[in-house]
C-alpha cells in the first residue's frame, strides 16, 4: 500500500511505498529534504508531523526529547507514513543550503570505453552519505595523487552510489591512474559539493540541454533529477561529440526518448572550436528560445561560444546555466 506525503512549507508531495522510510521516498522522488547521516544518528532530518500517522521502522541513536515527541517530531530516515501525512520539514532549495562534507568511498565499478573514456562508479562507506544537488561537482582524492574535481553524473536521489565520466588526459596523474592502475574496491576520499549548475525546479519553461563530450555528466545528473521530479515540460538534449567518436551513452539517451513523451535527443558532430554553428542550429530548432531554460556544459570556449549565440537570440541571462569543465 502506498500513501502520499506532503512536505511543508514547500508543498512538495510524493508517494511512500510500504516499508520505505519517508526520507528514502523523498530522495527517490528527486526532492532534497534536510538530512545528514540517513541512519538515525545525527537528527538533522527531524521533522514535525502536522497531520496523518507515522511509525518508526528503524532504530535510531538520536534521542528525541519527550517535549518534541508530544509536538509530533520524528526522524524522516527512520519513520514511514501509515496514511496520507503532512510534515513540517526543511528542504535544500539552493546549492548554498548543502554543507561541505568529506567522506570515504571505494571503487564499485570501472568501465573503460576504448582508450580515452571511462565511467567510474563509487560507493560511499557504510553508514555515510554525500549530500549534493544534481549537476554539482565534487573532489576525488586517491592516495598519493593530486585531487581531481569532477561533476557527479548521477542524481542526488542516490547519495551512496555516485557515477563519474572521465576523458583521458596524459598530463593528469589522476586520469592516468584511472586508465592504468585503478581497480575495484580501491579506496578514495570524496569532498564537496561545489557548483551552482543545478536544475531550476520551480521553472515550468521548456528546457534545452547542450553538452560537449564528457561534460554530458552533469547534464545527465540534471536530466535524472527532472525525471524523478516528473517534470512535464519539453526537454531537448543536444550532445556534441568529436568526429568519429559516437556518444558513449547513446543507448541510454535513446532509452529516455523511448520512455518519455516530453524528451528528445539529438547528436551533433562538431569540433569544440566551432560550437557556435550547432548553437545556431539549436536556436533555429527553437525560435522561441527566449522562453526556454538552457543548460550548457563543456570546455570553456565551447560554453562561451554557445552561450553568446543563445543570448544573441534573445535568451535572458537568468535562463542560461553554464558548467565549464575544470582543468586538473
Predicted regions mapped to residue ranges:
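FNR/FR-type flavoprotein reductase catalytic core
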Residues: 159-160, 166-328
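Short, charged beta-turn/beta-strand-edge "cap" motif at the junction between a beta-strand
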Residues: 93, 144-146, 192-197
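Residue-level "contact hotspot" at macromolecular interaction interfaces
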Residues: 15, 36, 80, 131, ...
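N-terminal pre-ligand scaffold of iron-sulfur
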Residues: 1-33
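Ferredoxin-reductase
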Residues: 99-187, 241-243, 270-271
Amino acid at each position: 500500500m502506498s500513501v502520499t506525503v506532503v512536505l511543508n512549507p514547500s508543498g512538495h508531495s510524493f508517494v511512500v511505498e510500504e516499508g520505505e522510510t519517508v526520507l528514502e521516498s523523498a530522495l527517490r522522488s528527486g526532492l532534497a529534504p534536510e538530512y545528514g547521516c540517513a541512519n538515525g544518528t545525527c537528527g538533522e532530518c527531524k521533522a514535525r508531523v502536522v497531520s496523518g500517522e507515522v511509525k518508526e521502522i528503524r532504530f535510531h541513536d538520536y534521542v528525541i526529547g519527550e517535549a518534541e515527541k508530544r509536538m509530533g517530531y520524528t526522524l524522516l530516515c527512520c519513520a514511514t507514513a501509515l496514511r496520507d501525512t503532512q510534515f513540517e520539514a526543511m528542504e535544500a532549495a539552493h546549492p548554498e543550503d548543502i554543507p561541505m562534507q568529506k567522506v570515504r568511498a571505494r571503487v564499485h565499478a570501472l568501465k573503460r570505453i576504448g582508450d580515452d573514456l571511462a565511467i567510474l562508479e563509487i560507493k560511499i562507506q557504510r553508514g555515510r552519505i554525500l549530500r549534493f544537488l544534481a549537476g554539482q561537482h565534487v573532489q576525488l582524492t586517491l592516495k598519493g595523487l593530486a585531487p581531481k574535481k569532477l561533476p557527479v553524473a548521477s542524481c542526488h536521489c542516490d547519495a551512496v552510489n555516485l557515477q563519474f565520466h572521465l576523458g583521458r588526459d596524459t598530463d593528469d596523474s589522476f586520469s592516468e591512474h584511472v586508465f592504468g592502475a585503478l581497480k575495484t574496491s580501491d579506496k578514495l576520499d570524496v569532498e564537496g559539493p561545489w557548483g551552482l549548475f543545478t536544475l531550476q525546479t520551480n521553472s515550468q519553461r521548456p528546457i534545452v540541454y547542450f553538452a560537449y563530450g564528457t561534460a554530458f555528466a552533469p547534464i545527465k545528473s540534471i536530466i535524472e533529477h527532472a525525471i524523478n521530479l516528473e517534470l512535464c515540460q519539453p526537454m531537448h538534449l543536444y550532445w556534441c561529440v568529436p568526429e568519429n567518436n559516437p556518444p558513449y551513452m547513446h543507448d541510454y539517451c535513446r532509452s529516455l526518448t523511448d520512455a518519455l513523451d516530453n524528451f528528445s535527443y539529438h547528436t551533433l558532430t562538431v569540433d569544440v572550436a566551432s560550437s557556435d554553428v550547432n548553437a545556431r542550429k539549436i536556436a533555429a530548432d527553437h525560435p522561441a528560445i527566449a522562453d526556454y531554460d538552457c543548460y550548457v556544459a563543456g570546455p570553456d570556449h565551447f560554453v562561451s561560444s554557445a552561450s553568446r549565440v543563445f543570448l544573441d537570440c534573445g535568451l535572458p541571462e537568468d535562463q542560461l546555466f553554464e558548467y565549464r569543465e575544470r582543468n586538473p
